[in-house]
């Protein structure tokens, strides 16, 4: 039977899923540990000093580290800001 008042959408089906992304910093031979850690501290919200240093060490040891994950728009902003400070960045990875 047709509902003349309109169709009610199922909220579970109608919610748009916003794309998420990962921000990854790559190791390089020219940025110092201090510079990388400072960039992470000043650009990534809620980044603690300990976490910034842990990520910096991981970048050095493994070649890269995911420094932030979340909605694509924010990921693009953090990626651009870190890149503008001279960090070597992997392309944004959509998840």
Regions found by a protein language model. Give the residues of each.
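Terminal domain-initiation and capping elements
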Residues: 1-95
